[in-house]
């Protein structure tokens, strides 16, 4: 069983690394503007091909948000994406199915009907604020959430990383129950990168998150296998050689 545990741990560690890569790339391109700084100093952006590098300017200009890459517009968050309240689904009406239910605190079971197409991005609206979730599958965002109904100049992976940077707790409009008003988020001033650059980031980040999804599925399968085999092995229903054969096939 230790081989199973090791494989599950490795998959989870790999996913943490992959997710960190997508986040670091976003911050480098759209927050710290590292490629622009490199070009302004006469250097080629590190680890970047010429076509992608050409999408970045080679200087900065003053704006109401401070220094921003030359030519990039200043707008509001709603120029990038539109948030919408999720859909009510009482527990008594839920039927287990293929589509994830996403609450303010994260995935919360499944349902046989989806209300939104994936890839999608969801954050908490009521109860739990500040968590942001990316799903590549069709899904049902519950009514305690806000989900990205429309990607304007943003894409799914770009929106995911952008929303993770926001301090949603500071927008709390509730009293006893933390509540997020989407209009407060929509009106935030934000620098708007060229659509071509956002799409270039999406091409890289989406492939990363697809790998994460595949690893999660494999880890889930292995976890279910471990939880099935272990009681049978302990009870004597399954012999060790038989267990080892099953593990070899799984791994």
Task: Provide a role label for each language-model segment.
Residues 2-32, 50-103, 195-202, 206-242:
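Non-catalytic DNA-recognition/assembly elements of restriction-modification systems
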Residues 37-193, 241-251:
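DNA target-recognition domains and sequence-specific DNA-contacting regions of bacterial/archaeal
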């Amino acid at each position: 069983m230790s081989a199973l545990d090791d494989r599950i741990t490795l998959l989870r560690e790999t996913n943490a690394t992959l997710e960190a890569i997508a986040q670091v790339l976003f911050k480098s391109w759209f927050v710290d503007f590292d490629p622009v700084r490199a070009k302004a100093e006469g250097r080629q952006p590190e680890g970047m091909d010429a076509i992608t590098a050409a999408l970045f300017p080679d200087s900065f200009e003053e704006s109401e948000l401070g220094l921003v890459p030359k030519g990039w517009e200043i707008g509001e968050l709603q120029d990038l994406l539109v948030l919408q309240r999720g859909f009510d689904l009482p527990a008594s009406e839920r039927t287990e199915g293929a589509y994830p239910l996403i609450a303010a605190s994260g995935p919360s079971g499944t349902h046989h009907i989806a209300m939104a197409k994936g890839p999608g991005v969801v954050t908490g609206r009521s109860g739990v604020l500040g968590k942001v979730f990316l799903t590549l599958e069709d899904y049902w965002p519950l009514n305690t959430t806000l989900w990205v109904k429309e990607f304007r100049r943003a894409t799914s992976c770009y929106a995911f990383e952008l929303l993770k940077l926001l301090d949603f707790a500071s927008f709390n409009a509730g009293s006893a129950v933390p509540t997020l008003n989407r209009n407060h988020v929509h009106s935030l001033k934000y620098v708007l990168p060229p659509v071509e650059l956002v799409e270039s980031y999406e091409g890289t980040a989406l492939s990363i998150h697809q790998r994460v999804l595949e690893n999660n599925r494999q880890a889930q399968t292995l976890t279910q296998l471990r939880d099935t085999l272990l009681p049978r092995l302990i009870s004597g229903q399954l012999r060790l050689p038989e267990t080892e054969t099953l593990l070899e096939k799984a791994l």
